[in-house]
Amino acid sequence: MHDLSEPARVVLAGALDEDENVDVLAPAVGSILVLTDRRLIVLRQGAESRPMTGIQSFALDRDLEVRIAPTIKQVTVASSGRAISVFMRREHLGDVESLVAELRRRIYAA
């Protein structure tokens, strides 16, 4: 799990199911988007000290909406009436687009 600090690795490892695999990581400002074999996780910087908001999990189903607004460098994740936004740096746009493309492929292949 590249680009993750040791505390972030520990928090993420604790949030994963025993047999869950991390497939794609995409950095964002103050957070990282994590696509596993069964869900999307938004892991915020400092998650180890804020367990209620530091890690958000979204099931890979057709309720999940992920929108990228490249002009303002914002990613919005919404599902089941809740939504969060993260910002990305221009140099990470390709990583985020790849993660979202893979996420959509998985959702709509089912």
Predicted regions and their residues:
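Residue-level detector of beta-strand structural context in well-folded domains
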Residues: 22-24, 31-32, 56, 64, ...
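Short acidic, glycine-rich loop/turn motifs
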Residues: 44-47, 77-81
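Canonical phosphoinositide-binding patch of PH/PH-like domains
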Residues: 80-99
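Phosphoinositide-dependent membrane-docking surfaces
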Residues: 40-41, 52-72
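Conserved beta-hairpin
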Residues: 26-48
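Short, mixed charged/polar active-site loops
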Residues: 32, 50-55, 83-85
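Anionic N-terminal interaction surfaces
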Residues: 1-33, 98
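Short loop/turn segments that connect beta-strands within the blades of beta-propeller domains
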Residues: 36-37, 71, 79
